Amino acid sequence: MLPGYNPLLLTPPFAMIAFDRLPAKNDPRLPVLLLQATFVTCGITFWGFNRSPAQVGLILLICVTLDCLLHYLLRRKNLLVPISGLITGLGLSVLTNFSHGLWLAAIPPFFATASKYVFTVNGRHIYNPGLFGVIAALVLSDGMITPAPAYQWGGAGITAFFIATAALMLFALNIRRSVLISCFLLFYALQLSLRAWLLRHHIPPQTLFMGAFSSPAFYLFTFFMITDPPTSAESRKGQVFMAFFIVFVDLLLHKFQSFSTLFYSAFAYMTLRGLWLLWQNRSQYRNPLPALKQFAKALLLTGLIGGTGWGAYRLTHAFSADEVTFHFSEIPASQSGIGGTKGDIWERTDPRMQHVAKWLLSVGDAAAVADADNDGLPDVFLTQPLKSEQDRAQLFLNKGNFRFERFPLPQLDDHRKHPETHGLIASATWFDMDNDGDQDLLLGMGFGKGRLLRNNLKETGTLGFTEVGNGNAVDDYQISVATNVLDYDNDGRLDIIIGNVMQRYLPGYDRTVPYNIFKLPQPEYQGDRRMFNVMHHSWHDANNADENLLLRNLGGGRFAQIPNSENGFSGKRWTMAVATGDLNDDGFADLYIANDFGPDELYINEQGKRFLPVKGSFAGSVGRDTYKGMNATFGDLDDNGRPDIHVSNVHEKLQAEGSLLWMNYSKSGQTDAAMFKDEAARRNALNERRFGWGAAFGDLDRDGRLDIVQANGMADDAYDKKEAVCPDYWYWNAQIALTNPDVHGYADRWADVRGRCVFGFEANRVYLNKGSYFVDVAEQAGWNKKGTSRGMVLADFDNDGDLDSLVTHMTAAPSLYRNDSRPAGWVGVELVGNGQTCNRDALGSKVVLAAGDSPTGAAQHREVYANNGLAAQSDRRILFGLGGKGSGEVSLSVRWCGRGDTETFKLKPGQYHRIEQK
C-alpha cells in the first residue's frame, strides 16, 4: 500500500451508467456523490486537505465538461447528465496532492476522464478512471503531483467513521463483493505479518500493523476502490484471485521500498484483466477495423485536447534568464579559518533515543552575522551543534580578504563540553540590547537555558562579553532553533521572541520534568512510556510542542515575559523560524511564524498592544497550510512597497507541497487574510523536488530586484555511514506517517534512522528575480555541490558591493562563497537609530531608492530586519543594485522606526554610507 496515501474510489460502482435524463431518486450514485461531497467540504474546511476551493472547482469543471464533450462526440447520444464526472472529480479532489495554483490540478481529471473513452472493451472502461488519473499524474508529472497523505483526514477518530460508512454503503448498494473484501483483508493481514517479521529489526511491528489498519486510506481502498463492479471480478474465484494478485504485487513492490504500492498493484490487475477481456472477446474482433477506428478517434480527440492544454501551459510558463553575471567561488577552510569536524553528540544522547537522535537533532546549525568589533567588517558566530567540542559555538572575527580568526568566548565552555547538562546552542541573533552602539548576542538553546551575552566594547574599548544575570526571562528552559528581535511597542528598545520547536516539559507527569534528549526519566512502573511521548501528534496540525515566548525589554539588560494571554499568541506549534517586519505599513512590527507539521501563523501588531492572529477560511490561504514550514523571510520582491513572505517547505515523495511565496497586496493598516496570495508556483519559486530549509533575499546581480537563495537536503550519512549506498529512510517514515498519534507520537515506535538518508544529497538553489518570475541559476552561478544545508546567509564580507554567501550544514563544515560579479552600480547604507524613539539597530526603518535611480524603473523598497530566515542572520546593511545607473548621486528616503520621521539623502554610489538619525 502507498504509505501515507488515500486510495479512494473515484468512480463508484455504477459510475458508467449513461443517464441521458435526470437521475432517479434511487440512483445508487447519488449517496456516493453526497458522501464524497461531504469528504471534500470537511477536508478543505475542518480537516487537513491541501486543496483550495478554486482547485476543487477546476477539477470538477474539467471532469464534468470533458465527460459531457467526449460522450457527445464519441458516442453520439443525448447530452450526458454528468453524475459520474462529478463523483470522479470529487474523488480526485480527495486523492491528489500538489502545490497551490491551478495548472497542476488539471492533470489528474483530464487523464481520468479520457481513460473512460480511450481504454474500453465492448464499450466499457477497463480502468477505474480515478485510479488511472492518479497513476498518469504520478508517472507524467515528474513528482509535481502525489497522492494525498493519510494525515489529511485529521485524526484517529475519523477511522471509525469511515469503517461504518464503508460498511453501510456496501450493505446499501449490495454490490456482491464480500468475497473480494474478506480475502483481501485476510491476505493483506498475512502479508503484513510477514513484512513485520522481516522488518522487525528496522521498525516496531506495532507501527506497521497500526499504520495500515488504523488508516482511513486503507478502508477507502478496501471498501470502495477494489469493489468497483466495472473493474473488478464478478465470480467468487475471480474475486479470490484479484485479492491475492493485488496483495502479492504489493508485497513485491515493498521489497523495493516503493511508494504508491496499492495503486500500482490495482493498476496492474486492471491492465491484465483488460487484456483478458480482449482475449475472451477476440471473436468479436475478427474485423478489428471498427474497434481500431473508435480507439484512434478517441485517442486523437483526447490527444488534441490534452495537447492544446499542454501548449497553453508551456506558453505561460516559459521561464528563462539572461546570462548570469556573477559567480560564487568557494573559499577553502584553509584560507578562511572557518571549519567544522564531526562530533559525538548523537552518541551522547540517551541510549533509548539514539535511533531517532539524527532526526530530532537535524536542525540548529546556525550562523549569525554582525560587526561585533565595530571595525566595519561583518563577523560570524556559528553554533555547529553536531560538530566537535572545539568547533561548537564559536565567534569568528573578519580580518579581511575572507580570513577569519576565532575569538574566545569562555562563557560558553559549559555548552561545548557538557551539552548533556547545559544544552546545545541552536540559534543566534546579534542585536543592540541596550542601545549603547555595540552588538550583543542572544543564544537560543536546545535542551537548556537561553543565554544573553552583553558586548562590552563601548564600555571598555575592547571586545569582550559578559553574561546578563541569571533570573532574566531569557534564562528560561528552551528547546528552540528560532530567535528574533523586534521593537513591538515602538518604545525604542528591542524586544525578544523565542520560538520553541518541541515540548519543553514531558507530559503525563505530576511534576515538572524537563525534556532532555540526553537523559530521559527512568520508567516508574511496568510499561511506563511517558518519556517517549515527545514526537509530533499530527503530521499536518501538530499542537503539542510548546508556547512561543515574547520578552519585553525593560532596559538595563532586563527582560520580562509577556503572557500569551496578553500578547495574543496561541497554540503550541513546532516553530522553526520567526520573521518580523511591518507587513501592513502601519509602523509596527508584525510576525510570521513558520511551523513544522502544521499551519504557519501570521500575527498583525495592533499598535503595540497585542498581536492579532490572521487566518484564512480555506486551504490555500494564509494560516491554513498543512505544510512543514522551515523558513520565513521578509522582503519586497515586486517593489510594491509591501514585504512579501517566503516560506520553505518540503516537496518530495508523499509531500508534493513546496515553498510558499506569500505576495503582499495589502492596503495600509489591513489586517485580514486577503492581504496575501501564494504565488510560488506561478512565479516558479516552488523549490520542487527538494527538502527546503533556510532561505535569504538579496540582490545578487545588482539589477535592482531581490533574488532568493535556498538551502536544501534533509539528512545524509556523513557522520554515521554504514553502507556503500545510503539506504532511504523516507520509506520507513512513510510507514510511520500512516499511524495515529498514539503510535507516531512516541519515539520508541519510530524506525531506526542511523545509517540512513532522507533526501541527503540535494543541490541548493539560486533564484534570480526576473520581475514576474524566478529562474534557478544555481549551476551557472557555481553552486554544483550537493548535500544537506540549513542556514543561508547573505553578507558583503569584503565590502566590495556584492553579496557573498555562507551556508551551514548539520554534518559538514560551513561553506563560504565569494561573489565574483561583473561591474555594476550599487549603493549601500547602514542605518543607526537615535536609541530613543528608534532603536540603535534601526530595525523597522524603511529605505526607498527613487524610481529614477533604479534600473527597473520602479522605486526599490527595503526595510531593516534583524534575523529573518531559518538558522541564519544576514548582513543588516541594505544594498541597492543600480545596474548601469551608477555614475551620479542617487536619492534615498529613510522613514525611521518609532515615530516614522522621514529624511531624504543624496548619496554617492559605489560605497557604504553610515546614516545616523538626528
Language-model features: locations:
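Beta-propeller blade termini
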Residues: 364-374, 397, 424-435, 454, ...
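Internal/C-terminal transmembrane anchor helices
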Residues: 290-315
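Hydrophobic beta-strand segments that make up the repeating blades of beta-propeller
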Residues: 379-384, 440-445, 496-500, 586, ...
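Beta-propeller blade repeat segments, especially FG-GAP/WD-type strand-to-loop junctions
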Residues: 325-328, 390-408, 449-468, 508-518, ...
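Gly/Ser/Thr/Pro-enriched helix-cap/hinge segments flanking short amphipathic alpha-helices
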Residues: 307-325, 336-337, 345-357, 363, ...
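N-terminal signal-anchor module of multipass membrane proteins
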Residues: 10-71
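Membrane-interface helix-loop-helix junctions at boundaries between adjacent transmembrane segments
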Residues: 77-155
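Repeat-based blade/solenoid architectures
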Residues: 338-366, 411-429, 471-484, 544, ...
